[in-house]
Amino acid sequence: TLPDGQTLPIDFAIDGAGRCDITMTWQGERAEVPEFGLLFPLRRELTEVSYQGLGPRETTADRTAGGKMGAWNYNVRQDFAQNSPVYPQDCGSRTGVYSATVTGSIPGICFAGNGMTFSALPYTPHELENARHLYELPRDDNKTIVRCAAFQRGVGGDNSWGAKPHADACFAVEKGTSFRFTIQK
């Protein structure tokens, strides 16, 4: 969601081979935002992720020390089940991702960016935010939601009192801040 009165142009350039270059450029005033990226709903058959970036488990802007750069694989639904907390919340982000391919029983799709934040979950952020318990999540299991972002705010919580993320894990967009990535078969 954008701040009131703000717009965010998104340019798509598609070549003859079906490669789509996407560029988002912030036009507004300086603003602190929780993330700067796009979500893509994919068909439920696309559940296997292979990526090059920090892994093998989730990493965030303030939780990269345990990640190792490499080639990693995971199943979207199994990864959510292993990483989901007692109550639903956004999880499964991978940082420093240069390419991620989502495949399954149908032809897959590849997302490529320059060290982007990537996630693939069986639920939308809205569904996760509105469920207080795991059993309140939709049972239709009919989608995979991919996030490609230039950045996503860190999780914070250095202590048990719910500390906010440190300044280096929070991000502000300035006029002209852009994010470019590619989608292709």
Where are these regions (language model features)?
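Beta-strand/loop-rich accessory regions of lumenal/periplasmic or secreted enzymes
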Residues: 1-185
